Amino acid sequence: MGFLRCCVYYGILAVVSFFIGRLLPKSWFHGDKFPYRCASWEAKLFRFLRVHEWQDKVPDMSKIVPKLIPAKKLDTDFRAQLPRMIEETCVAEFTHFVLILLGFYALRLWPGTGGAVVTAIYILFGNLPFLIIQRYNRPRLQKLLAAQQRRSRRNQEVQQ
């Protein structure tokens, strides 16, 4: 019975957190400020974890809810979407972090080894990889945005 309670709890968390993530004001999320700003050491960690090799292999919410912007299918005007994409990485990171914290409640629903195993699986495979992917992709998107902004400034200077 504990397993079923945990699964129902995690399912409800997933659905509710998705909708809350969509409703949160995007003005709360800034990729260049704490806690979303990536530290310099994170790039080494991501290389060690080989995030670039497995990030495309994990399930992607944008395939389930196509209104999200899938990074793999950028249209020709993707540069205009970069600020929103950066915000989305912050929202997704926040959501998965909260889900990790709330995931520990399952230990009350199913105390003991079984609950601990299910909670560990939920956190280690259901949320942590997605949080890592957001932190891995955000600096790359920020570099693209910065390059785009530099190009725009140069073009404006040339036109004047």
What are these regions (language model features)?
Residues M1-S17, G21, L101-L102, R138, ...:
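N-terminal leader/auxiliary helical segments
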Residues M1-Y9, R108-I121:
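Hydrophobic alpha-helical transmembrane segments
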Residues C7-W54, I123-L131:
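Hydrophobic alpha-helical membrane-embedded segments
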Residues V16, F97-F104, A120, L124:
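Hydrophobic alpha-helical transmembrane segments of multipass integral membrane proteins
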Residues I20, L102-L109, P129-I132:
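Residue-level signal for alpha-helical transmembrane segments in multi-pass membrane proteins
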Residues S27-Q81, M85, A147-Q160:
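Membrane-proximal soluble regions of multi-pass membrane proteins
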Residues D32, R135-A146:
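A cytosolic-side transmembrane-helix exit/cap motif
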Residues L82-G114:
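Transmembrane alpha-helical segments and their cytosolic interface motifs
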